[in-house]
């Protein structure tokens, strides 16, 4: 049976259809916002998965190019692996939903959001979060807390709910807020140095606007939601929990109070070995339960240490940042390098400058077609002292790379100011918490070292949270290390400059964040960020005055768009000859802006000279140094500009009478000529006699 429900959000219709499509899924809905439509299917396994200690939720965000009326590029002509944007959107759906499933739920759950129609005014990624929550709430899967998502823009001093395509272009803020009725579940933001109080007000605005969508979901559930199944929740048997606690709690507490990371890990390894030795014969089939009990006790100790004892595992104050180290210019042949160290977290970022033609072309459903600034993040196993095969970037690496990219994007100079493609690669050399924000700092150092005139230096910091079980007690921590991230309840990453925030990403393991926590985290991050920026400025106070000698040399020139065909030539003949002769790369925009780049500056100068010659107009009355290309009985043909030839009649070759043209000039001679006329057919008439006369008069005057 087909059910529909509809509401109005920000002046546009939001509609859900349930029961019409995907009849064999637990729940399948078609959710639309304007003309953007998402098909969402959710399913769960009948039984919990055995032998695991985590919740096996998978979220897939599937882009279909037919949704924007495109046929995929390439030979195969069908969608391939998910784009980076699709991976990021899948992560954004997962993060607010995961903490709201029942604790101990071990059934496999899959959420598939397929983008089937896109209207640029209504972003599919925002609708997909709402659709995933709606489908889960309507299904029989034990998910009962609706989550809503909105985007908030900022034009002038006015917040805009779900801005249109045009409004997004004008907006200085791109903020996504996900919330339940009571608390904020997730924040994603990018902005043009947004002040802290403005960002907090924008988050409040987004939270309030989420309530209408939550109400819409609740109405749909009350009208046609399925009855919820009673889940089989995993719980560590009391007997095992008590036995492990009695045997190991004191040892765990003592080990977790060791401030040195390596000593603490060694002590915990010893404790775990003793636990295994004690219980592996008694409970051979429950070793995962024993591991879970140990984890719970470790978390209990850390929570007590922070909330009751007022101590952090490494002895720092709650608002204290670890020791900072900054260095530039490490690698001799790269265009720019930055090494950033914070405690045991260390990231080396390398900047590479390329020609404008090396931009990344994006073949997706978004409005963005290309990128000239990109950031890639690598997290090898050795960064945590482990051994595992090296593979391509996973979802986490792609997410962290995009986060650091967003943090610096508003600070990158325009194409006109700095005609280069910019690629940053952050290599995580050592990881003990907040490598994504360390890569923001490393990126700033690398850009400054590469001579990129960024607007201002940026830095990032990760704030953490520890709460009591009932959420009545909470403490915000500055610069969380690995242990605090692992056992903590929040990862609140903030990057920005002295002027304001450029990016935020917030994940939580609990059922949302209070207004106070958000306020304390944002202002705590500012204090830490300013301290880190001071360290960066001590290392390199401003961008290098010149780019590296190993970076390509570039030049730009503006030509008449009508002359583009003259530079390209028939079948690319002219431009290919320029490239072959000078060894440059040439990129021509539709508005006539030409970028020329090469490893050698001489090649750039030569190519620019040729292009200027090809596009320059011959003007009547001007004097040119031309080259004789052909001789006839009646005169000499002279090339005054590339592909621009005129005739010097025999009577205009010299002041005296000329019997034979060859008596005055030969093919290949360079002579001064004056343009006396350009006739109605575009033919150029030249005079050597007039040019000589003018030159003599100038000499007399001098």
UniProtKB/Swiss-Prot annotation:
Cofactors (names): Mg(2+)
GO biological-process terms attached to the record: mRNA catabolic process; RNA processing
SUPFAM superfamilies in the cross-refs: Eukaryotic type KH-domain (KH-domain type I) (SSF54791), Nucleic acid-binding proteins (SSF50249), Ribonuclease PH domain 2-like (SSF55666), Ribosomal protein S5 domain 2-like (SSF54211)
List of residues binding Mg(2+): 485, 491
Localisation: Cytoplasm
Cysteine pairings via disulfide bonds: none
All residue ranges annotated as the KH domain in the record: 552-611
CC annotations in GO: cytosol
Keywords: Cytoplasm, Magnesium, Metal-binding, Nucleotidyltransferase, RNA-binding, Transferase
Source superkingdom: Bacteria
Class of the enzyme per the UniProt entry, highest EC level: transferase
Domain S1 motif residue range list: 621-689
Catalytic activity: RNA(n+1) + phosphate = RNA(n) + a ribonucleoside 5'-diphosphate
Main location group: cytoplasm
Family annotation (InterPro entries): ExoRNase_PH_dom1 (IPR001247), ExoRNase_PH_dom2 (IPR015847), ExoRNase_PH_dom2_sf (IPR036345), KH_dom (IPR004087), KH_dom_type_1 (IPR004088), KH_dom_type_1_sf (IPR036612), NA-bd_OB-fold (IPR012340), PNPase (IPR012162)
EC number: 2.7.7.8
Matches recorded under HAMAP family: PNPase (MF_01595)
Family, similarity comment: Belongs to the polyribonucleotide nucleotidyltransferase family.
Function comment: Involved in mRNA degradation. Catalyzes the phosphorolysis of single-stranded polyribonucleotides processively in the 3'- to 5'-direction.
Protein name: Polyribonucleotide nucleotidyltransferase
Organism encoding this protein: Clostridium perfringens (strain SM101 / Type A)
Gene (UniProt): pnp
